[in-house]
Each structure stands twice: as structure tokens, then as C-alpha cells.
Amino acid sequence: VCDRDLVIPQERFSRDGARDLQDQIWRIAQSQGAEAFKPHKGSYIEDDHLPFLRAGLKVVNLIHWPFPKSWHTSGDTIDRCSADSLQQVGRVISEFIYRQGEPL
């Protein structure tokens, strides 16, 4: 979640299993102007979150999609990271966690 050209669509397994949490995260992102969080539905991405969803736990996968060409290659280096992208994700998730004690 730190690519310079970060794009985080609404991953579909998360949408199916934790729509309410995903909606909360995207509302926070919108209110903060976090442009990396895109309002469109993404793809079904098989990733580490699936066992949790299958166990009945609500989880949301925040993942850059489509994967950049450098993803998991020798070109996937620190210079491709962006402090702004990390800050957007960090602020959104911090606010999401903070709000968990509040009524919806």
C-alpha cells in the first residue's frame, strides 16, 4: 500500500464478506480526500484475507490493483514507494480503528 501510483479498489471478496466495514473505510477515505481509495469495485483477489473470511470473520483487503509490472520482481524496490500513499492509508485506517468504539 505504498506504490507511487497507488490504486485501491473495493476488493470483491471483502465486499461480499464485510461490506459494512469496507463501506466505512471508503467513507472515511472520501471524507479525508484519500485519492488512492477508488469507489469502483475491483476484482476477486485470492490473498491472505480469505481464510479469515471463510472462518466468518469480517476483514477487508486493501490491495493495489491492478498489480504494477514491478510487483514481486527485482524492480519492486523502495524507490517505488510513496510517503503520500503510506500516509493516506495510515490516516484512513487510524481513523477507522478510532471510530470502532462509536455507534454507526
Task: Please annotate each region the language model reported.
Residues 2-104:
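Active-site-adjacent substrate-binding region
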